[in-house]
């Protein structure tokens, strides 16, 4: 069994605004609350935030919806992110804006749309949470999910301390205590996550006050290396919006999506270059 080290993070902020939005496409009203991003068979995949249909939307790299996939035996209480491995898509239904959810889960769905394999549920809780009273400053909300090795890694959204805590859960169906393995001092609130195994690159999106948005990168990220990490933080040159998802293309190029906000008439798909 592989040993998973407690990850220790050193906050070394390298902040710049030199990146550019290289491409910018409007998204359909059907996905106006886009809140996750993946790539499968050269198609981008997204889903809506809370209250939408329990569906995945497959779209071109110009943002056109080409296919809608309804997720059977699932509901969308507050889907926040998705990730994948070689065989499955994992959808994080763990939005917890008011601190009171006791039904946090991740849906495990075959990548193959024609598969007869049934969808499965990975339920979890934060073992440190001892109160479920409504609290807008909850530290048990999350918007980031990645697949890494044989685990799923959840990034919490701590509004009070502007940090993210990292929790591991298995990829197998069942009910689990999520295992806290580290804290990342990002001085902001995490809104999306992605990991590229080949590049060993972790990428996050974040905000401070929903007026400024950032892209965060950490190189050589691994669960099996006990080390300190350098955190690179780049301001995204975008007006007030709500950046919700990220997908790595290369070390210097990323797809991001933003929700439909009052300052725009539509959600957006953007390609950003550092």
Regions found by a protein language model. Give the residues of each.
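Sequence/structural signature of beta-propeller domains
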Residues: 19-274
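Bacterial Sec-dependent N-terminal signal peptides
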Residues: 1-22
């Amino acid at each position: 069994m592989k040993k998973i080290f407690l990850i220790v993070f050193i906050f070394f902020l390298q902040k710049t605004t030199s990146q550019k939005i290289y491409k910018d496409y409007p998204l359909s009203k059907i996905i106006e609350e886009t809140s996750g991003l993946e790539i499968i068979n050269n198609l981008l995949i997204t889903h809506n935030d809370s209250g939408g249909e329990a569906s995945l939307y497959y779209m071109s790299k110009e943002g056109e919806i080409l296919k809608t996939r309804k997720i059977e035996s699932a509901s969308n209480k507050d889907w926040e992110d998705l990730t994948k491995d070689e065989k499955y898509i994992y959808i994080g239904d763990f939005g917890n804006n008011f601190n009171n959810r006791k039904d946090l889960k991740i849906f495990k769905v075959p990548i193959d749309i024609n598969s007869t394999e049934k969808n499965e549920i990975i339920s979890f809780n934060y073992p440190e949470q001892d109160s479920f009273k409504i609290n807008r400053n909850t530290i048990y909300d999350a918007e980031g999910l990645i697949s890494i090795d044989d685990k799923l890694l959840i990034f919490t959204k701590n509004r009070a301390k502007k940090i993210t805590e990292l929790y591991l859960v298995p990829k197998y169906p069942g009910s689990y205590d999520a295992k806290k393995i580290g804290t990342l001092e990002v001085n902001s609130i995490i809104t999306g996550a992605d990991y590229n195994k080949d590049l060993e690159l972790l990428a996050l999106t974040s905000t401070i006050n929903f007026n400024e948005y950032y892209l965060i990168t950490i190189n050589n990220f691994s669960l099996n290396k006990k080390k300190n990490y350098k955190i690179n933080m780049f301001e995204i040159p975008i007006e007030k919006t709500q950046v919700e998802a990220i997908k790595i293309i290369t070390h210097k190029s990323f797809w991001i999506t933003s929700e439909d906000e009052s300052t725009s008439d539509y959600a957006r798909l953007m390609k950003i270059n550092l």
